[in-house]
Amino acid sequence: MKIKLILVLIVFLTIVNVNNSIDLCLSNPKKALVNQACKYSTDCEYPLFCGSGNGYGKNATCSKNIETGGSCESNNQCTPCNVCFNAKCKVKLYLGDACDENKSYCSSSVCIKGKCSIQGDVCTANNQCKFNNYCKSGKCVPLEKEGSSCDKDSSCSLTNACVGGKCVTKYQKPLGAVCNSSNECQVFSGHVCGANGKCSVYNQLLSKCKENSDCGPNGMCMCKSETENVCVDLSVGALKNDKCPSLLSSFSSCMTRERCTENTPTGCPKCYPIFMCYQYSCFYMNQFIRSTQNYYKSFCS
């Protein structure tokens, strides 16, 4: 009788543990692949869309994106960084790019006299400006240099963060160094800016968990798979990977070397894959979120 009770208890605990994993995974479900059934594009793995020869709804399947120049009905049917414009998939153009008023699509700008421009030369958002520029007081200006004043991270270069009103180098301070933000610490070694104001080891990183309270005050318990939930840090969202600093440096150097003004597959084909591999290798959102993880991973092969 005791043996039966023990077996029942083991089965019960197993079911509870599995259900905990499934509960966390409800917000991170597996997605349908090419030719698998779907109702909406959100059912499909990114960047696939729901729709095929059968159309949407009944009998629809997840389909590969339509290439540049192909007929389309919506943006999500086109390849990433393209847009459906005048029923055709078009490459997004950015500020300063040459354009055709009837055939081109200028992202966050308009085609004026053959060039993507901001009407009145007044910007309202950073995405209207070229790479390494941001919108400040209505003008697109170069990003602030290290040590310069700033009010947010987007005012600084990719290798800098805005901390205490100054652009400072990211991810370099060693254990025990005084910090105001985890962006200053060696996050790819598993460090964060602790409650004591010093760079400290985040001991729970990627340890197994059942709920957020298992992961510390700035951590979250996240579904990695149906059988495994792990702790991640919310302040930066970094993974422990010694290759990440060199990936970031390689991307930054590539953009300078190639003189790219936009970080897109067409605007900077040599550098964009480095950036996407960096995103997958170094941040849990891009490695664990199952709707997009394979897309990001494809750039690391």
Curated annotation (Swiss-Prot):
Name recorded for this polypeptide: Uncharacterized protein DDB_G0272530
Signal peptide bounds: 1-21
- Source species, domain of life: Eukaryota
Compartmental location: Secreted
* One annotated Gene Ontology cellular component of this protein: extracellular space
An example of a GO molecular function for this protein is:
co-receptor binding
InterPro entries, sorted: Diff-Dev_Assoc_Protein (IPR052326), DUF7107 (IPR055531)
Q: Which GO terms describe its biological process?
A: negative regulation of canonical Wnt signaling pathway
Provide an example Pfam family for this protein.
DUF7107
What are the UniProt keywords, alphabetically? Glycoprotein, Secreted, Signal
Q: List the disulfide bonds.
A: none
Known glycosylation sites: N19, N59, N102, N180
